[in-house]
Curated annotation (Swiss-Prot):
Name recorded for this polypeptide: CAP-Gly domain-containing linker protein 1 homolog
Start-end of Basic and acidic residues biased regions: 285-295, 317-353, 383-396, 409-424, 463-473
SMART domains (alphabetical): CAP_GLY (SM01052)
InterPro entries in the cross-refs: CAP-Gly_dom_sf, CAP-Gly_domain
Low complexity bias spans: 492-501, 832-844
Length: 937
């Protein structure tokens, strides 16, 4: 695709962009306010404007869904779509003068008519304050309202169009959802200018891209790239050979899409079309309209090459010719610009036939037909079928009857003359799908009957009937020719009346339904076959009946035509009334324009007078200022000369003083220079002496340096040897230092062991002391026991002597008892519990005397340790070495307890030899202590 290298046209109404932030804007049905934000909103599609309203009619303070887009007073902020916001009329800047070299841009494909705001209904209030400029061959008015009454719907930016310099925040408001339902041509092509105008030769790529300050994103850049190039929606519907070529001779031509005319609308649609001020027609011509900055509306109209007129095309040509006459009348009247209140004449170019388009300059590639092409072919086939209807045959058959009224205007139209104005009528558009569907589902053509001889039809009817018919024809005035849409129901109504009265009409052309091309051929073949056959004779009655049928059919056509004429008269009256209203409105507007001109001229005169007065005042002021300036300059010159003389005298005195000081300084410097020369001579002599001394000193030093170096080397070797020894010692010491923690651990271990051994030694010493005391006690006890034993022996001897003598009976009874029974009790060692250990032992019969009591009382206060020690020693002395049955591991309670007496644990058994034997647990404990158990006190 080739990019457009055209400039940009002017927009009569400024579109709000991010560059207009802070300006006063007007929101539709809301009010005025200041623009604060332009850009997208989170959660919403499209571009929105944030406005701070002057009145508290808003809904928020600039925050929407938690996101703050701008700051405003509460209930003064509102978000509105960008197409509903327009700059206030007072804020609109004055446009620069128009560039006469602007060219129109156009699309390579037929534009799709969307919801065009120019075709919307407009209120009568707006029609009063605005003038409608009708473009030639078009019935859609382009309204140019006056100041402060322009509705936002008339903004050309709302149409489906794009510009190379369009800002990223501007979008068209067209709907692309009904593309198939609105396949018609576009009557106007606009080029929107946004920014500064450029030269014709300038390239658009060199123009800086207009970007928003607050809305810079990748999406905007991507959209601008799309806007800068032409976009083809789908494939071409008209063929590659018919596409226009850039920089071609017929550059302003636009290919057309042929449409099918719809049937005649009913009365309701007709009335509705009369009420609506804006009507829509499908037109074969596509004029280009350029709206410049100064408000002039230039209409350049070029008609593409037309084919042979058909039934449908004739209707459009007739309606176009009638609309052209109205447009020429309306275009001659002056119109008003909405912004400047100035008269902007509408220049209309004469309609000139366009030259046929040249052949394509590029090779046409054969492609497989697409769906759109097939649809277009079907549509063209249906149109060709309508063109090939047998119209001549119908005219020849009806020519016998009086000519109908609508014939004359058609001939005038064919000859090129003008016709009366016909009312505009809205024709409902149907998509191609429905047209094709109707073409496919059209009723089957009726079976052709054999035509009979038409010779009796040439017989003239009676004179009375012909006079009546001739009188009925001129009774209705001819107003306007009927369109093909109006003719079709007439043709279809004729067979209905004839069939209701009697049999079908002999001619097949009056049958119901639409005639197509194949029917013509079939009818011609049937007529030829009928001529070849033999025609039977026809009776007079049948002739009269046929003539009556034809007269009835003609009367029906006359009735229909009369009704149509009445409707046309009524429509013409309405149109004339509307025209009168428009003329009155135009007169009012002219009066207003004259008043405005007068007011403007008065203002201009007043401004001229005030300007002249200001000029005179300015000249007087300049002269007075010049005089005062000259006087001030003279005074300043005198003062400057006086100051200059004073300054010159002062400077001369200073120069003299400086010369005197300079001479004195020169004399001093001469003396110093002479002294410095003498010092230089003396220094040169000293230098020579010092150089000689330095040479001698250097030789002596060089000789001494070798000796010093050798001595230093020997000292270095000695130091290195000492360093080696010290390093070895350091290594040994480091090893010893590493062994210190191990030695400390061993020392701590040995200290712990020594403490343990000391404790054990102390325990043993204490045990020995205790044992020595126990031994001494035992010796004393042994001595005491021996003494008691001797005493007992003596007493026993005495008792035995007495027994032998038989002096005492008690003694004899005792002695008479056996020896075993006497000493059986003390021979047993009794082990008692802890509770019984504290108590005293019962006295035996053998110890009933005082010695036994004394023994028991003396031994009652001894310790259990003493008892165990005695048992240990006694067992060690008395018992044999292999005797281990008596070893008992006594519990700690026996060792630690100090209560009780030995008498409670010991029992003395007197054996035959008379030596006591101790049998107790202590003996076993003693053996265990000797075997290695240490005593802990």
């Amino acid at each position: 695709m080739n990019k457009s290298h055209l400039g940009t046209a002017d927009n009569p109404q400024e579109v709000v962009t991010a560059h207009d932030i802070g300006r006063l804007v007007d929101v539709v049905n809301v009010g005025k306010g200041f623009l604060r934000y332009v850009g997208p909103i989170h959660g919403k599609d499209g571009m929105f404007c944030g406005i701070e309203l002057l009145e508290p009619n808003g809904k928020h303070d600039g925050t929407f869904q938690g996101v703050s887009y701008f700051i405003a007073t509460p209930y003064h902020g509102i978000f509105a779509p960008i197409f509903r916001v327009t700059l206030d009329a007072e804020e609109l800047p004055k446009p620069p003068p128009p560039n006469p070299s602007n060219r129109l841009s156009r699309s390579a494909l037929p534009a799709l008519q969307l919801r065009n705001p120019l075709t919307q209904e407009r209120k009568p209030e707006e029609d009063v304050m605005s003038t409608s400029v009708y473009v030639s061959s078009s019935t859609k008015p382009i309204a140019i309202p006056t100041k402060q009454c322009r509705p936002p719907e008339t903004d050309p930016m709302q149409m489906s169009m794009f510009s190379d310099m369009m800002d990223g925040s501007m979008f068209s408001n067209g709907s692309w959802s009904d593309i198939a339902d609105s396949m018609i041509t576009s009557n106007c092509t606009f080029t929107v200018r946004k920014g500064l105008p450029i030269d014709d030769d300038g390239d658009l790529m060199s123009v800086p891209m207009v970007q928003s300050v607050f809305n810079i994103d990748r999406e905007a850049l991507r959209r601008e790239e799309q806007l800068q190039s032409s976009i083809v929606l789908g494939e071409s519907r008209i063929g590659v050979e018919h596409l226009p070529i850039i920089e071609d001779e017929n550059e302003l031509e636009t290919p057309l899409v042929e449409t099918r005319t719809m049937p005649l609308p009913n009365d309701l649609n007709a009335n509705f079309s009369n009420k609506n001020s804006t009507t829509t027609f499908v037109e074969p011509e596509t004029p280009k309209v350029e709206i410049r900055e100064n408000g002039n509306l230039d209409n350049s109209i070029e008609t593409p090459p037309q084919q042979s007129p058909s039934g449908s095309s004739m209707v459009s040509h007739e309606s176009d010719s009638s609309s052209k006459k109205d447009d020429t009348k309306s275009d001659k009247s002056p119109t008003k610009k909405s912004q400047k209140m100035e008269e902007k004449p509408v220049v209309k170019k004469k309609e000139e036939p366009a030259a046929p388009p040249p052949p394509p300059k590029f090779p046409v590639k054969q492609k497989a037909p697409s769906k759109h092409q097939l649809m277009m072919e079907q549509l063209k086939a249906s149109i060709e079928a309508e063109k090939t209807k047998p119209k001549k045959e119908i005219k020849s058959r009806v020519s016998l009857l009086p000519p109908p009224a609508p014939k004359a205007p058609q001939k005038e139209n064919k000859e090129g003359g003008e016709m009366t104005e016909t009312p505009r009528r809205t024709i409902t558009k149907t998509p191609l799908k429905t047209v094709n569907a109707k073409a496919k589902t059209s009723p089957t053509p009726p079976v052709e009957r054999q035509k009979k001889e038409r010779k009796p039809l040439y017989v003239a009817p009676p004179a009375k009937e012909r006079v009546e018919k001739e009188k009925k024809i001129p009774s209705k005035p001819v107003v306007s020719p009927p369109t093909t849409a109006e003719k079709k129901p007439v043709v279809s109504s004729i067979p209905s009346t004839s069939s209701a009265s009697k049999g079908p009409f002999p001619t097949s052309s009056f049958a119901g339904g639409k005639l197509q091309g194949p029917r013509k051929t079939s009818s011609s073949s049937t007529t030829t076959s009928a001529k070849k056959q033999k025609n039977p004779p026809i009776d007079e009655k049948e002739k009269l009946s046929r003539l009556q049928h034809s007269t009835h059919a003609f009367e029906a056509t006359l009735i229909v035509m009369n009704r149509i004429n009445e409707d046309n008269e009524r429509k013409l009256g309405n149109i004339s009334e509307q025209y009168e209203k428009k003329v009155s409105e135009l007169g009012d507007l002219k009066k207003m324009l004259d008043e405005a001109r007068k007011k403007f001229e008065e203002d201009v005169e007043q401004m001229k007078n005030s300007n002249q007065q200001v000029i005179r005042n300015h000249a007087n002021a300049v002269e007075s200022l010049q005089k005062t300036h000259e006087t001030q300059i003279a005074e300043k010159n005198k003062e400057f000369e006086r100051n200059f003389e004073e300054e010159r005298a002062r400077r001369e005195a200073e120069v003299c003083a400086m010369n005197n000081r300079h001479q004195k300084v020169v004399a001093c410097l001469d003396e110093k220079i002479s002294e410095a020369e003498k010092q230089c001579e003396q220094l040169n002599v000293d230098k020579k002496v010092l150089q000689a001394a330095l040479a001698n000193d250097c030789d002596h030093r060089n000789q001494m340096l070798t000796k010093e170096i050798s001595s230093l080397q020997t000292a270095l070797e000695m130091k290195s040897a000492e360093m080696k020894e010290l390093r070895q010692k350091n290594q040994n010491l480091s090893l010893q230092v590493d062994e210190i923690p191990l030695k400390e651990l061993e020392i701590s271990k040995w200290k712990h062991k020594s403490n343990e051994y000391k404790q054990m030694l102390d325990q043993k010493i204490n045990g020995e002391k205790i044992l020595v005391q126990q031994i001494e006690d035992l010796r004393r006890k042994q001595i005491h026991d021996e003494e008691e034993k001797e005493a007992m022996k003596r007493s026993f001897d005495l008792m035995q002597f007495k027994y032998e003598n038989g002096d005492d009976p008690n003694v004899t009874s005792v002695m008479s008892a056996p020896m075993e029974s006497r000493f059986s009790t003390p021979t047993k060692v009794q082990f008692r519990s802890r509770s019984s250990a504290s108590g005293s032992r019962p006295i035996s019969m053998a110890t009933s005397n005082g010695g036994d009591q004394r023994l028991s009382t003396s031994s009652h206060h001894d310790d259990s340790m003493n008892r165990s020690t005695i048992s240990m020693y006694t067992s060690h002395i008395r018992l044999p070495e292999n005797h281990a049955d008596d070893v008992i591991y006594a519990p700690d309670e026996i060792i630690s307890s100090r209560s009780g007496s030995i008498s409670q644990r010991l029992a003395i058994s007197i054996e035959n030899d008379g030596e006591p034997t101790i049998k107790s647990e202590s003996s076993r404990i003693g053996n265990t202590s000797d075997s290695g158990i240490g005593l802990v006190m």
